[in-house]
A protein has these predicted regions:
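A donor-sugar binding/catalytic signature common to diverse glycosyltransferases
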Residues: 175-220
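Leloir-type glycosyltransferase catalytic cores
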Residues: 146, 158, 214-253
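Generic beta-sheet signal
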Residues: 38, 202-204, 228
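Hydrophobic alpha-helical positions that pack around
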Residues: 26-30, 36-150, 241-246
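Active-site-proximal segments of catalytic enzyme domains
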Residues: 136-152, 156-172
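Beta-rich nucleic-acid/ligand-interaction surfaces
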Residues: 39-46, 166-176
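Aromatic- and Gly/Pro-rich donor/ligand-binding loops
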Residues: 1-22
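Short loop/turn segments at strand-loop or loop-helix junctions that form parts
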Residues: 2-7, 114-123, 230
Length: 253
């Protein structure tokens, strides 16, 4: 039996994990299964996901007979609704699926407090291939250099998440005591955060698109989550300028 996971925007990492890999919870994984996808030009985080799940998944070409597995569908896409974005069991399924397969080999020295830079986000596959505005910059902090300098002074390590493997990202979120980031796909790894991880999301108070997915994850997994919204929004893509002093005061408050 081969299962085909319904396409749900796999070039965006949140869509890949929650909507598509989350759909695996509908399959009996007590023994190894064959799965396929519409697009077979897999990128790095997709290939790394397959490697972590290689004991239960065998990824095959889609030119065979298959049974379609529906992707996970959002229940609510209204900001501040307080409603579940997807069936919360999806979060617990994914958390157990990956944490049970990731070792502790990554050296977390200097990674206790993290800021995830977003200055390269327009180069990521989803934004690079945006049909309306290819290479669009979304939710970037335009004075990020200033913000990085201030955060480094309080002992925060500033990194580009694109430089790390899926397994390393999972371990960083699981072991760090503080993670600060503009709202981004990388925050899907809050699925694996530890109960001690204080997550601070930076985002304008009037975003142009749905942005409560990480609030939803952290609410159900009982992970500390705060949102810093005292920013100057610059355009319709939620790019912003952040007062680094105000951000530091918020984080330390």
């Amino acid at each position: 039996m081969t299962y085909k996971i319904e396409e749900a925007g796999k070039t965006f990492i949140y869509h890949w994990f929650v909507y598509m890999l989350g759909a695996l919870k509908q399959i009996d994984l007590s023994s190894k299964v064959d799965v396929c996808f519409d697009r077979e030009d897999y990128n790095a985080y997709q290939k790394e996901s397959f490697e972590l799940l290689s004991d239960i998944l065998n990824v095959v070409p889609n030119d065979c007979q298959w049974d379609l597995v529906p992707s996970i569908k959002p229940r609510d896409i209204r900001n501040n609704s307080g409603q579940d974005h997807v069936d919360p069991s999806t979060y617990f399924f994914l958390r157990d699926l990956f944490l049970s397969r990731v070792d502790d080999k990554f050296d977390m020295t200097d990674y206790d407090k993290i800021y995830i830079c977003r200055g390269r986000s327009h180069l990521c596959e989803g934004n690079r291939e945006d049909s309306a505005v290819p290479g669009v910059r979304r939710r970037q902090i335009m004075n990020e250099g200033e913000v990085v300098e201030s955060l480094e002074e309080m002992g925060v390590k500033c990194i580009f998440f694109e430089d790390y493997t899926v397994a390393e990202k999972i371990q960083i979120f699981n072991k760090a005591s503080l993670i600060i980031s503009p709202q981004s796909g990388g925050m899907v790894f809050s699925l694996f955060a530890g109960p001690q991880t204080d997550i601070v999301e930076i985002y304008p108070p009037n975003p142009h698109q749905y942005c409560d997915q990480y609030i939803d994850i952290c609410r159900h997994l009982d992970i500390p989550f705060r949102r810093f919204t005292d920013v100057a929004k610059l355009d319709g893509y939620d790019n912003m300028v952040v007062d680094s002093t105000e951000l530091v005061n918020f984080v330390q408050g």
